[in-house]
Amino acid sequence: MAQAKTFTAEEFDALLDFVSKRSYAMRNRMMILISFWSGMRVGEIASLRIEDVVDAAGKVKREIRLDAAQTKGRHARTVFFPAKLAAELQIYVDARAVKDRKQPFFMTAGGKAFTANVMTQHFFWLYRKAGFETSSHSGRRNFLTQLSAKGIGIRVLASLAGHRNIQVTMRYIDASDDMKRNAVELI
């Protein structure tokens, strides 16, 4: 199976621009940002409830705890949100003004929770319609590749990804020509 595409900054901006002009723009933007800026799996994103992401005062948490049932490996883990993601999510949370903290964080057009499969298909079609041939895993792969390019160690990356084996994490990381050029300049 081919690896999911990693996006250039320009491609990522084009994707967000495309999404901004379509139905459910805010929801779709937030789904993409969580994928690209936290490295969460699509199934984990689909499983999120308001209470997972938002504290009792209505503020987006910077660290969220996924229980074992929410993760692929069935091991609870903490996901860290960068400040820029928390700020974007706060706008979404405030716009939704949800009172029921048990409600899904992302809902389909029909008002139901996304399943992992439906969200995977949703990402696939968002990408396809925006002109990108890739899968729902692109955001996660992009997240790990970008952090690797910035010098973050493989053990930290594995922990952020929820991988117990660094060999798995290494398969996610793309080594672009720009990364190689920058690497040799460090000599």
Residue ranges of each PLM-predicted region?
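DNA breakage-rejoining catalytic core of tyrosine-based enzymes
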Residues: 1-13, 73-82, 99-102
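N-terminal core-binding DNA-recognition domain of tyrosine site-specific recombinases/integrases
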Residues: 4, 23-26, 76, 113-117, ...
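Basic, Lys/Arg- and aromatic-enriched nucleic-acid-binding interface segment
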Residues: 9-38, 42
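Short, basic (Lys/Arg/His-rich) helix/loop patches that form interaction surfaces
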Residues: 17-24, 120-159
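A short, glycine-centered helix-capping/turn motif at helix boundaries
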Residues: 35-47, 150-152, 163
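Conserved tyrosine-mediated DNA breakage-rejoining catalytic core shared by Y-recombinases
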Residues: 47-76, 80, 85
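Catalytic-site neighborhood detector that most strongly recognizes the C-terminal catalytic loop/helix
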Residues: 66, 70, 161-186
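C-terminal catalytic core of Y-nucleophile DNA break-rejoin enzymes
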Residues: 70-90, 103-124
